[in-house]
Structure formats: structure tokens, C-alpha cells
């Protein structure tokens, strides 16, 4: 049976220099664990899991430090390890503080109404359309609330929150018209 590269971690760590290892310290009150190259981060706002099976690097968690070492020594390999490090950093920040996107409902003539039901956002009366435009809420821990002319999206997972905001914005895109004139829609105006 052929072995996978991450099963030979000791061999790879012994071969390369220590310069190309990117490290990340885990703050207090947060626990990071890894099972089958799936990293889970736990904190006061919940847990986040991310699968790193296709990452061409070695992941090691020791003494509250996450070590990421790429297999190669090229610039692209270092960029991949830095990207994985920033993803884990975003997971830690999300579990500590959470992320919040604020979107503004903009309309000129037909008043847009936004409702949240069953993990979906319904945009009604967009340009007087009788059928509601539907966009999906990504992730179980992502919450969407409507406060007047604002739509607030919050949650611990940055990718889920930003993808939900993108889904809402894309569902209200105006097609076959000049977008400088027809400005109706829902747009992101604040990221926290």
C-alpha cells in the first residue's frame, strides 16, 4: 500500500530547514485539535471545523503552537503555508469575537421587503416582481437579522458570513440594465 505524504511527517520535517516553517500561537481560552487533517477550533462562540486534507504541507499542533511546513521549498509552497496560517488565524478570531457584515437595502420606487425563513433570505417586491428572490444562508451558526433598512449577518465563521452576504447581493443583481442608473439592491457597507 502506498503511503501518503503526510504520513511521512517525521521524514519530511527532518529533511528541510526550519526557516520555512510558519508558526501560529494559540491564545488562552481557545483549544485547537486535529483529527485526520481536519482542524477544529473551540472557543466561547462555538466550534469551527476546516478540512486540510488537500493542503500540500505538514500540520503539527504542539504546546499551543500550530506548525505548518510545506513539502517543497519554492515561493508557491511558502504562499500555501501562509494561506493556511491565515485561515486558522481567521478561525481563532471568529471563535473569540465573531464576524459581522452589515448590508443596506437600497430602492428608488418599489419598496423592497426582506424576510428570513428556514435558512433562506427572501427578497420580495424587487422592482415590483411578484416572485420573491431567494438566497441561501451558508453555515449552521450564521445568523441573519433584518433591522429596518439594514440586513445584519453575524457568525463565527468568516467564510460562511461573507458567502451569505455575497449570496444576498448576487440575488438582487440587476441584469440587462445600466447598473449606474438602476441602483436598487442590497449592498455590503460595513465589515466588523
What are the functions of these language-model segments?
Residues 2-192:
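Ribosome-associated RNA-binding proteins
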